[in-house]
């Protein structure tokens, strides 16, 4: 972390003596720059190109040094469009990596990869900045205590609980609800834990980023009247940005989260949507730098790049960063090198199912595919563990019986199997839940359900005490008491119709 004596623009540190070079070659977003002998910049240094294009428009492009080519040449990747750049333009070496503003000034604001505000709400206090390239915390600083991070979402807390300071992968194809689940988590964490969140939009749609910002303002996570009371900082590098920006925007978001953890000693939630786009941008840059591709055309440095990002996301004795990362799965193939490399770093996986989304069960979390290293009796306790296992057994049995049901019908099943199917269908519906951020779509007020209440509800269904209630009573409710109240209302409505 650096305290800047001046309030110079973010992204570039203030230096008295600056070395300068000239552009020798431009290949799309990659620049080759020639420097005088003995004045070469270091790897990862930020270079700034300032000048005017042929039309007289001002140019200000920041690049990051990636390779030293020899003969006093370096190869750098641009963080913004290189339109208008020409050979021979002056390039200034800032003498330090990209630095971005950190701390309370970032809350409620939207930044780009350079830490520049892009929300038209005026300048940001840049007296405190931090470089985006840092080493991971030392072993001695790490906190190894295992504790559950309660989200208030029943299916997550019961079947695939999140670890405080852990890394969670949100797997799903296009349009099954990854972003809605992320928005609900930001909302719940802000309200229930009072913690701050940092959202890194890596290579996703500009429209989604805009929708997220608007919904955060509506739900109060971003406070427009008093911006300092906001609970989230947003960092965007959308699909239309050059690959350099998409590759580094995750590090910008992580740097902001690290400050809240290390200096403010807070528990932080870091969202990365989408980690696959980080890999994809790295692959593009790797090809532009002339590296030989590896499996399926990915960069040969895939594991190293992923590791250098993921190892910085951890709990220390000062605070924790719990990270939730949306993982796009290309062609729904989990063996693709990008999702497969991500898997190795995760403590829990929340898998979203297109089949459940088609049934209208939201959140469409697959209860049998989602996993967590925290679901052990020694960590969550015997009651929670046994309830979760029985729920999974019931759902698994229902899945096995579905072929028989579709061919022969329910009547051909034994009495015991029919009971299992009835309970499984109730469980499946009870795993759905109305979200605060989806109130406008569902018309139902959002619900936050505590872990103890979640366990009690599923134990009652499994025990058979609620066998007499209709299964639609369990759909889109919070606690089990709401389900029984809904059943009574349904019964009253049917009596009135008679």
Curated annotation (Swiss-Prot):
Its EC number is 7.1.2.2. Its main location: plastid. Gene3D superfamilies: 2.40.10.170, Bovine Mitochondrial F1-atpase, Atp Synthase Beta Chain, Chain D, domain 3, P-loop containing nucleotide triphosphate hydrolases. ATP binds at residues 172-179. InterPro entries: AAA+_ATPase (IPR003593), ATP-synt_VA_C (IPR055190), ATP_synth_F1_bsu (IPR005722), ATPase_a/bsu_AS (IPR020003), ATPase_alpha/beta_chains (IPR050053), ATPase_F1/V1/A1_a/bsu_N (IPR004100), ATPase_F1/V1/A1_a/bsu_N_sf (IPR036121), ATPase_F1/V1/A1_a/bsu_nucl-bd (IPR000194). It catalyses: ATP + H2O + 4 H(+)(in) = ADP + phosphate + 5 H(+)(out). It is an enzyme of class 7 (translocase). Keywords: ATP synthesis, ATP-binding, CF(1), Chloroplast, Hydrogen ion transport, Ion transport, Membrane, Nucleotide-binding, Plastid, Thylakoid, Translocase, Transport. GO terms for biological process: proton motive force-driven mitochondrial ATP synthesis. It is found in: Plastid, Chloroplast thylakoid membrane. One of its GO terms (molecular function) is ATP hydrolysis activity. It is a peripheral membrane protein. F-type ATPases have 2 components, CF(1) - the catalytic core - and CF(0) - the membrane proton channel. CF(1) has five subunits: alpha(3), beta(3), gamma(1), delta(1), epsilon(1). CF(0) has four main subunits: a(1), b(1), b'(1) and c(9-12). Belongs to the ATPase alpha/beta chains family. NCBIfam families: atpD. HAMAP family: ATP_synth_beta_bact (MF_01347). This is ATP synthase subunit beta, chloroplastic. The lineage of its organism: Eukaryota, Viridiplantae, Streptophyta, Embryophyta, Tracheophyta.
